[in-house]
């Protein structure tokens, strides 16, 4: 369990999913404390917008102001809701919005946890540009090492004059004043042609490897099985290229695209609509924490390129959760296929969970593994 004391209240916070006790990761960071310190003497007038509040430290601390929590992570929303409940704060105190939603007009305060990707930051700053005023207090925070010249230039370009604070506990803040600088329009998605197909892949701002096909997915696509039927899953679908390939290779199968990022799920939907419209009726699109709440014994196969980081933190907790959810939701003799970096040693992890694991293909960087749900394992 992680604790944070600040000028607003004392909170008990935990990550979501929880990390193990051997290598615990905190549910808050110095940048959260630093941001809250800046508001100690501030009279807040107008809506409070909080962007990219990973586990709800800011939302819980500012709950009395009925903030809007804006981001592109269903896991973050679940974590924030859990921490609100755990601290005896009504979940209704916080309004949750996707990054692509319309933001409330004329906010009094905007707090931004600087995201990992500049593309997401730019999308969010452009959305803020439509609603903030010169009187809106705009403060962003991150580890000092994660604030670069390009970060500051982006604030200047989209919103206006920008300054930084001194570092405190290895965190730094960005202060910005809206001045309505001239700014050219930008497309909502980035698109590129997928090699060896006639497909155009559309990517929202927060989609993994949005500028081109990542090498792990390329390797995975070379070894996807054919002649599958029933329901199969692209788990952690991103822009949906794996699911698209499965749709094309398996005309008797229905594909469920699942991701915790609303932008990823929307990108997958858009890519099916524009590239395989005739297959759209064979698709389901789901924003979810892996396969939480999905009935057991439903799927014939699950395909997964699991992440090994959550925001800036390295962790295999999400991958572990995906593997356990896959086993629960697979039919007997159903198969889980994954692609992963070789150094992660998922072979032994899958063998521990499923009781078996086979190597389908390998190269100098990646490995494709298959585990089968056996009848005697519940």
From Swiss-Prot:
It is found in: Cytoplasm. Pfam families: MTS. Its main location: cytoplasm. GO terms for cellular component: cytoplasm. GO terms for molecular function: 23S rRNA (guanine(1835)-N(2))-methyltransferase activity; nucleic acid binding. SUPFAM superfamilies: S-adenosyl-L-methionine-dependent methyltransferases (SSF53335). It comes from the Bacteria. CDD domains: AdoMet_MTases. The keyword Transferase applies. Its EC number is 2.1.1.174. It catalyses: guanosine(1835) in 23S rRNA + S-adenosyl-L-methionine = N(2)-methylguanosine(1835) in 23S rRNA + S-adenosyl-L-homocysteine + H(+). Keywords: Cytoplasm, Methyltransferase, rRNA processing, S-adenosyl-L-methionine, Transferase. The keyword Cytoplasm applies. Specifically methylates the guanine in position 1835 (m2G1835) of 23S rRNA. Belongs to the methyltransferase superfamily. RlmG family. HAMAP family: 23SrRNA_methyltr_G. This is Ribosomal RNA large subunit methyltransferase G. It comes from Salmonella dublin (strain CT_02021853). The gene is rlmG.
């Amino acid at each position: 369990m992680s604790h944070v004391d600040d000028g607003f209240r004392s909170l008990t916070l935990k990550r979501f999913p929880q990390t193990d006790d051997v290598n615990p990761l905190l549910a808050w960071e110095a940048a959260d404390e630093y941001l809250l310190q800046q508001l100690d003497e501030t009279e807040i007038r107008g809506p409070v917008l909080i962007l990219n509040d990973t586990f709800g430290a800011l939302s819980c601390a500012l709950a009395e102001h009925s903030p809007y929590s804006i981001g592109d992570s269903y896991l973050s929303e679940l974590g924030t809701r859990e921490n609100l409940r755990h601290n005896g704060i009504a979940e209704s105190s916080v309004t949750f919005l996707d990054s692509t939603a319309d933001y409330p007009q004329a906010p009094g305060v905007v707090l931004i946890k600087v995201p990992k990707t500049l593309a997401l930051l730019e999308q969010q700053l452009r959305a803020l540009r439509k609603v903030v005023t010169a009187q809106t207090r705009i403060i962003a925070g991150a580890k000092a090492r994660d604030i670069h010249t390009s970060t500051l230039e982006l604030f200047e370009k989209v919103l206006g004059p920008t300054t930084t604070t001194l570092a405190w506990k290895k965190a730094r803040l960005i202060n910005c004043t809206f001045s309505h600088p001239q700014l050219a329009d930008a497309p909502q998605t980035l698109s590129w042609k997928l090699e060896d197909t006639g497909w155009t892949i559309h990517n929202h701002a927060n989609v993994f490897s949005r500028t081109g096909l990542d090498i792990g997915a390329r390797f995975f696509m070379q070894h996807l099985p054919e002649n599958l039927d029933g329901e199969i899953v692209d788990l952690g679908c991103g822009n949906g290229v794996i699911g698209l390939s499965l749709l094309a290779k398996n005309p008797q199968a229905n594909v469920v695209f699942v991701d915790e990022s609303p932008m990823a799920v929307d990108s997958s939907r858009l890519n099916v609509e524009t590239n395989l419209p005739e297959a759209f009726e064979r698709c389901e699109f789901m924003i979810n924490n892996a396969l939480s709440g999905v009935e057991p014994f439903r799927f014939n196969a699950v395909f997964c390129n699991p992440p090994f980081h959550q925001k800036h933190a390295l962790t295999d907790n999400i991958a572990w959760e995906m593997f356990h959810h896959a086993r629960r939701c697979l039919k007997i003799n159903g198969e889980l296929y994954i692609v992963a970096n070789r150094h992660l040693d998922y072979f032994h992890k899958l063998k521990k969970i499923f009781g078996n694991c086979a190597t389908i293909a390998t190269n100098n960087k990646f490995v494709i593994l298959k585990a089968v749900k056996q009848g005697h394992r519940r």
